[in-house]
Amino acid sequence: MSNEGNGGGPDYDVVRRVVRSRKTAKVLADPDRPVDFDEATRARLDPLVREAILEAGWAPFHYNRAHGGLAEPWRVHLLFQKDCRKVAECLEGWSGDLAPVGKLPSMFAACGAAALITWVPQFRTGGPGAESGKQQAVDDEHLAASASLVQNALLLLTAAGFGTYWSSGGAALREPGIAARLGIDAQESLLALLFVDYPGSPADLSRKPGKNRDLRSDGWLREVSLS
């Protein structure tokens, strides 16, 4: 149902369609036989991914993080296919006995790009002493702002015709040595690993839908009426 003429409009309808059409799809390939997009495809699609991530940076943030000369509390480490294939090939060796890698090599082998999205805690650094309530609130704001960037990125990539999967990144990518290989500073905390499935990827790849999509309801909305 359109909201044009009663407070909505075409922009509302477009955004609503994108929000509803965004869906989780875990795409897997054999790490020994990774997906190989040709140069023309990469030249056409890589800039669209980069642009979507940059536009996602219009997410709101409440406090100036003032870290590394940047106000934003988030960082994005973007890998395109060549480097995704390198991770797929090497991750198990990098990890060794440190942490299980799970399906990550198969996911890196299938994607056209991957974005490691981190946030930069200001007080929640794991050092001695408890944070004050104010400090906890500031870091909660930094984390919430960074999560809004993740959703922006998912919606923009969906609107551009890409498939997406939001992974936590697992334990392996949080190992300091592996994180450093991927450009993640020691002060950053991994929030999301977004895998980007390029249009035209092989149809015979394993694709697993999100398990929670059919569990959605509107029971979380509570309208408050004060007497």
Model-derived regions, located:
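Active-site-adjacent structural patch at catalytic or cofactor/ligand-binding sites
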Residues: 109-122
